[in-house]
């Protein structure tokens, strides 16, 4: 029997216990041994819940018990999660986590400790919930040089943008609806400002480069400035707007960005709607591939965590190699990235056509039915730096959204 401990009995922690119980026969068969929860660490007690007999309040109980071979960390946040996970690894216990904040900040360090002790630190659920993207990068796609990873990595914002697109609603309306339906946190800042997606693409960027990519270095925009009017233009152009997290290779370096983008209806991420997530991968041998599924939620996330537990049970005292060194990779400046830009401009198109073309060069003019005293343009491909220089001097820009090719 393999004894495990679960750190945190919130949404995901209780989901892990539920998955292990409901699917115990198939899980034990695939692990090659019986997996049993011995302890659950939480500050709270749960009277009336069968889990109460396994509740402990002191991490040392888990660390000092040689029977515990695998620890599941689903507490969230960087501390005390980092201290607890580090101590567990140093005590020779493998760890599986869904904690993106922990992995983005300390993933390389924790992987190094696991390597030294011939144990494992796995984190499939930290990026795409139930989407097996990390396992794919570490196994199925190891023969490829990954040229691009672009994903819809946040279910809350994708739900909101989908509602805005199909129902013509404004941002504040769909945020309230997301709250009411349980898709948004009480404080939605991490989701709507793009911070959640940023940490996830930082993890993926670190994995494809083999070096530490700091999430603080990734240019990040959220969806708070997206309006009903933006969606009207998108429909006119047979496009949609998604919050994309993207990492693209340029030689030995990477460009990384999190920002809303306009997608044409031929783009593989165009039809990913609601709370679903998807990751588009391009490899130099594979070509294009898509991974799609539930990016969050109790059971999809717990399922991914338990899959890591099974992997660790099959590899006790044998490290599963993950290339992610502590050496930091400097990202290429966003000013050097090349895109087309959709720009909304105030005023009459006929009156401003000449000055617009003089400033931006050859552009495509766009009108949205029902909108007056404004028009839109799509520029030719230019660098972000070139666009910013033009925009600084050009009066009447209402909003800009990058176009994803």
Predicted regions and their residues:
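N-terminal glycine-/serine-/threonine-rich beta1-alpha1-beta2 phosphate-ribose binding loop
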Residues: 1-90
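Rossmann-like NAD(P)H-binding beta-loop-alpha module
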Residues: 68, 115-196, 203
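Rossmann-fold NAD(P)-binding glycine/threonine-rich loop
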Residues: 81-87, 91, 100-138
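A short hydrophobic/small-residue beta-strand
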Residues: 94-96
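Substrate-binding/catalytic subdomain of NAD(P)-dependent oxidoreductase enzymes
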Residues: 175-271, 276-278
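Low-complexity, glycine/alanine/valine/leucine- and proline-rich hydrophobic stretches
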Residues: 260-284, 298, 359-371, 379-381
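ATP-dependent carboxylate/acyl-activation modules
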Residues: 268-323, 330-336
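A conserved regulatory-domain signal marking ACT and ACT-like small-molecule sensing domains
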Residues: 309-405
């Amino acid at each position: 029997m393999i004894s495990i401990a679960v750190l945190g009995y919130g949404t995901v922690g209780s989901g892990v216990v539920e998955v292990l119980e409901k699917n115990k026969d198939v899980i034990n068969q695939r692990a090659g041994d019986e997996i049993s929860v011995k302890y659950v660490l939480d500050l709270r007690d749960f009277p009336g819940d069968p889990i109460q007999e396994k509740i402990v309040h002191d991490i040392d109980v888990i660390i000092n018990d040689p029977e515990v071979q695998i620890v599941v960390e689903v507490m969230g946040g960087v501390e005390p999660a980092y201290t607890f996970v580090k101590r567990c690894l140093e005590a020779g216990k493998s760890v599986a986590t869904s904690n993106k904040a922990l992995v983005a900040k300390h993933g390389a360090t924790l992987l190094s400790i696991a390597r030294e002790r011939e144990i494992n630190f796995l984190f499939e659920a930290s990026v795409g919930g139930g989407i097996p993207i990390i396992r794919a990068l570490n196994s199925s796609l190891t023969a490829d040089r990954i040229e691009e990873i672009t994903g819809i990595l946040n279910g809350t914002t994708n739900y909101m943008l989908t509602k805005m697109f199909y129902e013509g609603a404004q941002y504040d309306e769909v945020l309230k609806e997301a709250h009411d339906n349980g898709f948004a946190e009480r404080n939605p800042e991490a989701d709507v400002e793009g911070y959640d997606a940023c940490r996830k693409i930082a993890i993926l960027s670190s994995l494809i480069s083999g070096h530490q990519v700091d999430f603080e270095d990734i240019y990040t925009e959220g969806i708070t400035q997206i309006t009903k009017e933006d969606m009207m233009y998108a429909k006119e152009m047979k496009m949609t707007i998604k919050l994309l997290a993207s990492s693209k290779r340029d030689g030995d370096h990477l460009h990384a960005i999190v920002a809303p983008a306009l997608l044409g209806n031929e783009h593989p991420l165009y039809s990913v709607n609601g709370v679903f997530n998807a990751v588009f991968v391009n490899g130099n041998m594979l070509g294009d591939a898509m991974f799609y599924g539930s990016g969050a939620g109790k059971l999809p996330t717990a399922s991914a965590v338990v899959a890591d537990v099974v992997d660790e049970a099959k590899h006790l005292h044998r490290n599963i190699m993950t290339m992610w060194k502590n050496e930091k990779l400097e990202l290429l400046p966003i000013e050097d990235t090349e895109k087309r830009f959709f720009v909304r401009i105030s005023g009459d198109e006929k009156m401003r056509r000449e000055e617009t073309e003089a400033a931006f060069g050859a552009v495509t003019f766009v009108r949205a039915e029902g909108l007056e005293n404004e028009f839109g343009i799509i520029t030719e491909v230019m660098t972000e730096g070139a666009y910013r220089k033009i925009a600084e001097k050009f009066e009447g820009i209402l909003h800009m959204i990058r176009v994803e090719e």
